[in-house]
């Protein structure tokens, strides 16, 4: 399993819209990472509940070795890269 970055967002969330641009930029740069986006209002997979998402935007990173990292709030490109590459 490759490193996976999961972004939890909502379409009505202003900071999520801004963060989406940063997410797309970093996604293009880190091609070895799987990027997943989950709209919390349409999440039928239960991921938002599993990762205890209570505010958006919220980012969860799952590493190959099973370790995880998470942060709530809008991140800039450098912060997102640091979260993913911890």
Identify the residue ranges that each predicted region occupies:
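The canonical Cys-X-X-Cys-His
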Residues: 13-16, 59
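Short active-site neighborhood of thiol/selenol oxidoreductases, capturing the structured segment around
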Residues: 1-9
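Non-catalytic, surface beta->alpha helical segment in thiol-disulfide oxidoreductase systems
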Residues: 55, 60-86
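Short alpha-helical
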Residues: 14, 42-43, 78
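Typically the conserved alpha-helix immediately C-terminal to a functionally engaged Cys/Sec
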Residues: 17-30
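Short glycine/proline-enriched coil/turn segments at helix->beta-strand junctions
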Residues: 2, 30-33, 86
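Thiol-based oxidoreductase modules, predominantly thioredoxin-like and allied folds used
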Residues: 8, 27-45
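Short Fe-S-cluster ligation motifs
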Residues: 43-55
